[in-house]
Amino acid sequence: MEPFRIHKGTAAVLMNDNIDTDQIIPKQYLKRIERTGFGKFLFDEWRYDNERHENPNFPLNAPDRKGASILITGNNFGCGSSREHAPWALADYGFRVIIAGGFADIFYMNCMKNGMLPIVMDKEMREKLVKTDAREQIEVDLENEVITTSTHRFHFTIEKMWKEKLLNGLDEISITMQYEQEIKEYERRIAAY
């Protein structure tokens, strides 16, 4: 997993509350186990019409929001069924940071396990971020827990364990591999059956 220290990018805005994992990535696209290729199906039923043409009224389809790597959204983002495909779709689309009023617990953890930074921020601060020019680069500094625009500076908090994992690009496998020698020692000491 790539370390996350400072990220600069533009923001897309989808301020709906209670966006669930079925809306993030519909069930018909969950037959694959690779982590890539899901970005084109992100928010599929909102982004496209029945003929698979882009819906011009959907915020992510706005020309000045394409290529955004920060998503600013409402409360309870990622609720619903637990599926890791939802963070895979967001990451594959290009998002590195999701700023919401709150997240479903499992979704929140799955974001960090996949190298994305979910930030909980109150509505007033999110509304200030939403007013940022669509072309402006927003800086997210994980180490100092600060978001900076040309006109505002916001502080956020993140649990120390998750912060360290993201800063160092560690997932469960890489953490386990840090103990490879101890695991081998343990296996040598244990009798085979």
From Swiss-Prot:
UniProt keyword Amino-acid biosynthesis present: yes
Keyword list, A-Z: Amino-acid biosynthesis, Branched-chain amino acid biosynthesis, Leucine biosynthesis, Lyase
Pathway assigned to this chain's UniProt record: Amino-acid biosynthesis; L-leucine biosynthesis; L-leucine from 3-methyl-2-oxobutanoate: step 2/4
A biological process term (GO) from this entry: L-leucine biosynthetic process
GO cellular component term of the entry, any: 3-isopropylmalate dehydratase complex
EC number(s) given by UniProt: 4.2.1.33
Pfam families in the record: Aconitase_C (PF00694)
Keyword Membrane: no
Gene Ontology molecular function terms on file: 3-isopropylmalate dehydratase activity
Reactions the enzyme catalyzes: (2R,3S)-3-isopropylmalate = (2S)-2-isopropylmalate
NCBIfam families: leuD, PRK01641.1
Function (record text): Catalyzes the isomerization between 2-isopropylmalate and 3-isopropylmalate, via the formation of 2-isopropylmaleate.
Quaternary structure annotation from Swiss-Prot or TrEMBL: Heterodimer of LeuC and LeuD.
HAMAP family (UniProt xref): LeuD_type1 (MF_01031)
Family: Belongs to the LeuD family. LeuD type 1 subfamily.
Protein name from the UniProt record: 3-isopropylmalate dehydratase small subunit
Organism: Bacillus anthracis
Source lineage: Bacteria, Bacillati, Bacillota, Bacilli, Bacillales
Recorded name of the encoding gene: leuD
